[in-house]
């Protein structure tokens, strides 16, 4: 354990044989402040867009809401469209990323295009979207413009963040230091973010 309760991020290389090939995987591993050793990608996500969580009961009741999609009309008659997506933040010196399951907002035409791509296996394009969750360990991320990349086979779309000076954009484009990734994961562990999903809109393990 490092001084002052800071979790240790440890190198861990796994070599596997696949046929005639030896494949090396640099796994992320750290000893948490809880005393346990964790290996692999930290995974956390949100059950709903923050904007949807704050809507009154009648709006939620009339919404089209599922595990991966959300569309609703607010009390002013405005329509909103969202999709759940996966943000992979690289961890330096590791092949395991820090993964966030978050919600992005789309315009109507892009939402329709994404729904169509979700059912196909040949999607190869990007859509303009906006993150609609605040990641708790970063400066505000709600409203951050991103690119949404549909994936084949009804898989979650992935998120790309253009280069800018926001801490999340820097982490996405340059990678996050292993020790910092361990500290972030430890904050969720200490907060008891594990097991059954808590209330909608709060981080949960994917």
Question: What residue spans do the PLM features occupy?
Answer:
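Basic, glycine-/proline-tolerant helical and adjacent loop/strand elements
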Residues: 11-92, 96
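Arginine residue identity/basic-tract feature
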Residues: 17-18, 26-31, 67, 79, ...
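Charged, low-complexity interaction segments
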Residues: 63-152
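C-terminal, charged low-complexity interaction regions
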Residues: 117-206
């Amino acid at each position: 354990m490092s001084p002052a309760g800071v979790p240790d991020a440890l190198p861990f290389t796994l070599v596997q044989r696949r046929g005639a090939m030896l494949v090396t995987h640099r796994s992320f591993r750290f000893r948490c402040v809880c005393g346990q050793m964790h290996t692999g990608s930290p995974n956390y996500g949100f059950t709903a867009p923050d904007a949807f969580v704050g809507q009154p009961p009648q709006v939620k009741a009339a919404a089209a809401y599922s595990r991966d999609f959300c569309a609703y009309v607010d009390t002013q008659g405005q329509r909103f469209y969202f999709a759940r997506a996966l943000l992979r933040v690289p961890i330096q010196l590791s092949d395991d990323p820090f993964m966030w399951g978050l919600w992005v907002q789309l315009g109507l035409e892009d939402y329709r295009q994404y729904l169509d791509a979700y059912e196909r296996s040949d999607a190869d394009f990007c859509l303009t979207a906006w993150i609609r969750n605040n990641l708790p360990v970063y400066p505000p991320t709600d409203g951050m413009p991103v690119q949404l990349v549909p994936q084949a086979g009804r898989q979650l779309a992935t998120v790309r963040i253009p280069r800018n000076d926001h801490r999340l954009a820097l982490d996405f484009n340059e990678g996050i230091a292993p020790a910092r990734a361990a500290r972030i994961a430890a904050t969720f562990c200490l907060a008891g973010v594990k097991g059954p999903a808590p209330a909608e809109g709060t981080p949960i393990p994917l």
